[in-house]
Amino acid sequence: MKFRFIFFFSFLIAEKADLVIQNAYVWTVDLSKPKAEAVAVRNNKIIFVGSNKAVQKYIDGNTNIIDAHGKLVLPGFNDNHVHFESTCRIVTGLNLLDVHQEKPFISRIRDVHERFTPGVWITGGLWSAYQAWESSSIGEEGRKAKINFFKPQRKMVDSFTAERPIFIQRFDRKMFFANSKALAIAGITKDRADPPNIHVERDKKGNPTGILTGSSVQKYFNNIIPPRSWEQRVWESEAVLKHCARFGVTSLSDMSDARQREIFYYLHNENKLTVRIHSRGYLDQWEKMSELGIKIGSGDSMIRLGTVKAWIDGIMGNSTARFYKAYSHNSDEFGIWRKIMFPWRSQDGGRDLQSNLEYLAIKADSAGIQLSVHAIGDAANGYLLDMMDRLNEHNGVKNRRFRLVHAQVIRPDDFKRFNNMSIIAEVQPYHCTDDMRWMEERIGHERSKGAYAFRSLWDSGAVVSFGSDSPGTNASRYPLNPMLGLYAAVTRQTLDGKPADGWFPDEKLSVEEAIQAYTLNSAYASFEENIKGSITEGKLADLVILSDNLLEIDPSKIKDVEVKTTIFNGTVIYQQ
């Protein structure tokens, strides 16, 4: 009896919390207990969700107490689609998407130059993207030709980059810029002829101005620019982790390759990884993954594996997304199919009527690996729904949680096909805010009704999961900030509030639904809903405290809400 009493008493002591949040408006995203006032955390798990009064028994002299002063507490955000390595380059490097004048061009380059280690190349840039969007649709060659694009000169930056090579590109990758240091390293001088398939713009004296065009420019410099060092890549990754903490992102699904996974494992081993990673391989790597025993659920709560990715069409920005009917602005253009869509050829030279995608998908699915496929246009999304039918016939109906990546434009008749198909609509709502400016010009009003159709997807039975697609494309920046995605899903307006009622307002989601899509549904998408995604006793202690209550403020103000505190794995990692 004495032993039992001591054991019971020890159990009570063990339940004292390391961290308690009280006086909060806790929105749990847990239907069994949607609201609370307080949360208690021990180690890295939530041990209590309930009232201010009841949480007191979890507090002792060692408990870190956070008084939320009525602020909104949510589960940490889970971004369903991030290109982490590319985001590193944007967050720490040169972003010129909105630059098309000399002063900001110089200022941005100077800022990066002062932050970078001596001798490291400055690359990227993508200048004049917003200039193109604001002037006209870049999908129409005739109109695009009228734009007087900004053309930088090496003399703008040579004075402070004498020992720093710079090689950057315009957003359309048809014009490049190099400073004097980079030109010298490349052997492009006044006295040398232009390299093959490269046009070097020169002044009246024959000196290179810094502007390069031609089909071989990128390849030529790729052979010169050294790969980023391990130390540089670690530094960049740590910078993005801080960026995530600032925005309350505690989990993300990464599209980067194995090199970035090496960085994640290194940071994890050093106890510096402050975001849970769901990392995807490529579809054609399924067999190697299977041989290594990798399948759905492989890994741990910090780095999760078991998903592969593929692409079947292009993007809206350059009119390569695949549609059943031609683009409205170009009657000869239907978009493209990626090579993976071509019929599979067996080793004996025979031809299988399945696409290579379908052949590989059946194999990977049979091996217990989750599939995720990029599809933008209605024909691309329609094909994947057809493929899902055949996948069910071939491998049987199961809880495969097929990730339909982007699902940007869906035909009206295809929405009903999502029901009972175990499909994750892996969408990025900020795309809507960005693309609505020109979508109807590209595909017309009727087809646009099925674009970024969050409500129709939700009501169809698909599990709608949200993310950012950070860092974006060569024509647009997609920030990691979840508030912009939530704003887009709830208002369907541009950041300056247009149109007044929202673009196709029937497709809006409620604030509660949008929060669920950015938390619990993204956890469900990676088979992790039992360990994270809601503020539930027993789940991982990843939490955010916001400056304003998303459930009470005018939806137009959501984009301006800030994260006050981010808690990851039971530890405060960001405080405003």
For each of these PLM feature ranges, what is it?
Residues 83, 302-320, 422-433, 491:
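Non-cysteine beta-strand/loop elements that form the S-adenosyl-L-methionine
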Residues 362-372, 379-402, 406, 412-416, ...:
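His/Asp/Glu-enriched, well-ordered alpha-helical/loop segment
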Residues 1-8:
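Sec-dependent signal peptide recognition
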